[in-house]
Amino acid sequence: MRRLTTAVFVTCVVLGFVGTPVASAQQQLSFSVGGFSPRPVDARATGDVLVKDLDYLAFRVSDFSGPLFGAEYLAGLGDNFDAGIGVGFYQRTVPTVYNDFVNANGTEIEQDLKLRVVPFTATVRWLPMGHHNGVEPYIGAGVGVFNYRYSESGQFLATDKSIFRGTFVGSGTATGPVILGGVRVPVGSWGVGGELRWQSAEGKLPADQDFSGSKIDLGGFSYTFTINVRF
């Protein structure tokens, strides 16, 4: 919560120093739907739990690619800048089995790996063509506060080769940079567009849960279709 408050505070400070008061600036709500793709294996953080799990579980990191939904409030800072505060939601469950071991009856030793991320972001966009053109390309950057929950649930192999059922959970918040770019096409008081985002953050996992890694890499790319409502 402290990190989220900091992100919101940073955006409010930016708004406070704008020459044009926000109350009289162009404002809009942006709703987005698209997908999130996590960092590939060779780009993930050292100690990442998914990379460690690949040593003995059958899955791919790309299996965690999944749908992403979001909403954002945007306020114009003059004709060439926007400041925004947004929230999103991503969740993905990936079924896995052990690579080299099975149950005594020959069935697979099965688990579910589940990752949920709720990103809160504070961003600033630069619109080189301004707000009053038929097409509005933009680039921007900001900070993200990523609320995450990672779990592994199902059957597991103990050190003595016995099989047991269990659920292991790690959750928390992590902060990191956000870089974005996109284009909007105004249609009256509405607008449509597309956006690409890159994010980077690492979430810590509790040692008492015996995960194979000490962290979960939350970085990756998101690509969304946007609908904007101006007011």
Which residue stretches match the model-derived regions?
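Extracellular/periplasm-exposed beta-strand and loop segments of Gram-negative cell-envelope proteins
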Residues: 38-64, 89-120, 146-174, 201-222
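Repeated loop/turn-to-beta-strand initiation elements of outer-membrane beta-barrel proteins
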Residues: 80-83, 132, 188-192
